């Protein structure tokens, strides 16, 4: 049987070749143009175990969804009832066009990848967001604002990254700015993998993260005494109410305590220490400053930053 897939067995990716696939190709090497040295080279590459190099993710989630036929996939040859309202422009990648409302993106298209093969058939905002952020098609809810909270079931991509890659640096592994990112909760992973939500817009002149510093009049010694007292109360709660709920509350407290006691976290959130020229390059807007803050958080060790920006809602 002829098979020219060089990914991991059956439906894999291009980062390796399994021994089974190599043997399947071996019998048709001449037909496929693969010599024995080429096959050995492919197998050696697969054995090297070279994995993904990315350490962090910044996801800009455009709430409501601006239309793809206005931005990345204009379909200029489609009937006017289908194609977008804007004209296509050429980019610095030959053969690739995008919407004329993105002129700066057109000059750096070689620096990013446009995926035009992703879609789903759900036109409800709530259910569609759940599908995008969790990878699971909702099987309940009516897509309206009063639907059952979907993030109570499946974990979001941010929680998955947090769980699989773990904690590093002085900041939480999963952070949302400036508000929760749709159904971006931990689902059945539990509170340990919930996002830390900034709840403040970094474009504001007086931007600061709530409760990041010790309360006025509270010394470090007094803070440590309170922390030990809290630990004793938690142990009592575990005995009286069971481990599950107490553990969830403990996770929230620990996240807050880590931020309060971490100089690195305070530095990452200190937007006033940033070079004014760099802030201006990002744009003195909510989205621009959220992107700059996200960069600072990633540099401080955050695994996944979710930026929520919207609401977009195109109806014709």
Label for each model-derived stretch:
Residues 1-316:
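Ligand-binding pockets and gating/stacking loops
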């Amino acid at each position: 049987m002829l098979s020219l897939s060089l990914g991991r067995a059956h439906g894999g990716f291009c980062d390796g070749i399994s021994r089974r696939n190599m043997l399947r190709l071996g019998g048709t090497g001449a037909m496929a143009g693969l010599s024995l040295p080429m096959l050995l080279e492919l197998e050696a590459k697969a054995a090297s175990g070279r994995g993904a190099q990315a350490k962090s993710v910044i996801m800009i989630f455009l709430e409501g969804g601006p239309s793809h036929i206005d931005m990345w996939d204009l379909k200029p040859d489609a009937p006017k009832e289908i194609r977008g309202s804007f004209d296509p422009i050429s980019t610095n990648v030959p053969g690739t066009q995008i919407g004329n409302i993105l002129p700066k993106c057109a000059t750096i298209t070689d620096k990013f990848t446009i995926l035009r093969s992703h879609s789903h058939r759900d036109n409800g905002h709530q259910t569609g967001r759940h599908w995008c952020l969790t990878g699971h098609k909702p099987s309940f809810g009516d897509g309206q604002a009063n639907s059952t909270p979907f993030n109570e079931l499946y974990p979001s991509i941010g929680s998955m990254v947090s769980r699989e890659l773990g904690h590093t640096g002085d900041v939480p592994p999963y952070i949302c700015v400036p508000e929760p990112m749709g159904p971006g909760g931990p689902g059945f992973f539990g509170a340990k993998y919930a996002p830390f939500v900034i709840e403040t817009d970094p474009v504001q002149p007086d931007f600061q993260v709530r409760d990041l510093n010790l309360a006025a009049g509270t010394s470090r010694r007094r803070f440590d005494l309170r922390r030990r007292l809290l630990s004793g109360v938690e142990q009592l709660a575990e005995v009286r109410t069971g481990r599950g709920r107490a553990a969830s509350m403990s996770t929230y407290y620990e996240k807050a305590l880590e931020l309060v006691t971490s100089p690195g976290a305070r530095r990452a959130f200190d937007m006033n220490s940033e070079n004014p020229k760099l802030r201006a390059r990002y744009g003195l807007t909510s989205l621009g400053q959220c992107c700059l803050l996200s960069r600072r958080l990633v540099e401080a060790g955050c695994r996944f930053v979710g930026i929520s920006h919207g609401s977009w809602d195109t109806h014709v």
